[in-house]
């Protein structure tokens, strides 16, 4: 297949970006969030389960036979090369691509990152869904800005410290247990480590340009070591083991905060986060809406699946003049026969209550 530029490739690029946005939400909550939030913040439960099943496959059980690279005709002048699901077993023969900027090798049978030294103009490398166990041999890719090695078999973050121009790093659904070896990535804007085995937020204080941090579906017990990330606008921590909202005082530019599926009991610690437009605290153990009356920018408020009983708590949201979406279902107050009517009366700006739009 000749790898060519054009309308077809542009469409492929757009599909890759949509895929990557979805994987960036690896925190796994209600599918409705994908429709109501400005950026996709969660992977649907079914997609997450499918991904887990893929990620846990034993590569030794793989019955597909690798393709012979000599049967693939590469366009030497191509800037964008998409070889998604080609049964490629080894990275080889790509040295002819002197002009390539984007190389997509998704859903192949690759076990090792190798033979990329000649691709010095490469800016995006996509190795999503392969059988890679180690990040290595990237030193020559000095122009690389986007790297995706999600859904592989990685256990450590390594081999990226020399790729100092990286802006986006995706390592979703691996077996990583520690955040490390990222201190040289001063240009990094997005870091996605969802669905791993991480227990602590650490070793990210030099990532001062970071704008989006996704750590959903890990084993993190505490919000900490975030003080240096003053440019952070999106923080996603769903499906961890958090019990308290804390450590966010320096995140004055934070706009979207996702804390669903944890063990949080009290809304607190948001005194300095005045730019929040999205607050997701669904599926926790919270009994009361409090300590957020100073937030005037929220457009979405997710507090479904908690322990909210009192209608007077909704007064805490009246300062949010742009509030359009609230999720309060599966709280005790939903048992009220006038549930939707009372929400509308308390929050007249709201246009969507749970999954249903308000009719006037």
Swiss-Prot record:
Signal peptide: none annotated. Keywords: Acetylation, Leucine-rich repeat, Nucleus, Phosphoprotein, Repeat. Transmembrane segments: none annotated. The modification Phosphoserine is found at residues 12, 24, 27, 44, 47, 322. It is found in: Nucleus. It holds the Pfam family LRR_9. InterPro entries: Cilia_flagella_integrity (IPR050576), Leu-rich_rpt (IPR001611), Leu-rich_rpt_4 (IPR025875), Leu-rich_rpt_typical-subtyp (IPR003591), LRR_dom_sf (IPR032675), U2A'_phosphoprotein32A_C (IPR003603). LRR repeats lie at residues 77-98, 99-120, 121-142, 143-164, 165-186, 187-208, 209-230, 231-252, 253-274, 275-296, 297-318. Residues 1-64 are annotated as: Disordered. The modification N-acetylalanine is found at residue 2. Residues 331-360 form the LRRCT domain. Residues 17-34 have a biased composition (Basic and acidic residues). Residues 53-63 have a biased composition (Acidic residues). GO terms for cellular component: nucleus. Regulatory subunit of protein phosphatase 1. PANTHER family: PROTEIN PHOSPHATASE 1 REGULATORY SUBUNIT 7 (PTHR45973:SF23), PROTEIN PHOSPHATASE 1 REGULATORY SUBUNIT SDS22-RELATED (PTHR45973). Interacts with PPP1CA, PPP1CB and PPP1CC/PPP1G. Belongs to the SDS22 family. This is Protein phosphatase 1 regulatory subunit 7. It comes from Pongo abelii.
């Amino acid at each position: 297949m000749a790898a060519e530029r054009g309308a077809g490739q542009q469409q492929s690029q757009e599909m890759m970006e949509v895929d990557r946005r979805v994987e960036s939400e690896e925190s796994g909550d209600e599918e409705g969030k994908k429709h109501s939030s400005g950026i996709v913040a969660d992977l649907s439960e079914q997609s997450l389960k499918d991904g887990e099943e893929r990620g846990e496959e034993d590569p030794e059980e793989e019955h597909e036979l690798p393709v012979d690279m000599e049967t693939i005709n590469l366009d030497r002048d191509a800037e964008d090369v998409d070889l998604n699901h080609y049964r490629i077993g080894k990275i080889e023969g790509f040295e002819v691509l002197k002009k390539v900027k984007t190389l997509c090798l998704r859903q192949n049978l690759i076990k090792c990152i190798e033979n990329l030294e000649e691709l010095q103009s490469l800016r995006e490398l996509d190795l999503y869904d392969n059988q890679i166990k180690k990040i290595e041999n990237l030193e020559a890719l000095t122009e690389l800005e986007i790297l995706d090695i999600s859904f592989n078999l990685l256990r450590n973050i390594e081999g990226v410290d020399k790729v100092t121009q990286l802006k986006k790093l995706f390592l979703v659904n691996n077996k990583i247990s520690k955040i490390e070896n990222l201190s040289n990535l001063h240009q990094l804007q997005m870091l996605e480590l969802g669905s791993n085995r991480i227990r602590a937020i650490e070793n990210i204080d030099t990532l001062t340009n970071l704008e989006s941090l996704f750590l959903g579906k890990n084993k993190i017990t505490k919000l900490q070591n975030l003080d240096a990330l003053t440019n952070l606008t999106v923080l996603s921590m769903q499906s961890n083991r958090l019990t308290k909202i804390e450590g966010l005082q320096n995140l004055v530019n934070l706009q979207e905060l996702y804390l669903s599926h944890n063990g949080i009991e009290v809304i607190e610690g948001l005194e300095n986060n005045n730019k929040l437009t999205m607050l997701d605290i669904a599926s926790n153990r919270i009994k009361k809406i409090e300590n957020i009356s100073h937030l005037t920018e929220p457009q979405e408020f997710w507090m479904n699946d908690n322990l909210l009983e009192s209608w007077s708590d909704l007064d805490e949201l009246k300062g949010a003049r742009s509030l359009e979406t609230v999720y309060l279902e599966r709280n005790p107050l939903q048992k009220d026969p006038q549930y939707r009517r009372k929400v509308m009366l308390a929050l007249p700006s709201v246009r969507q209550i749970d999954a249903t739009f308000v009719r006037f």
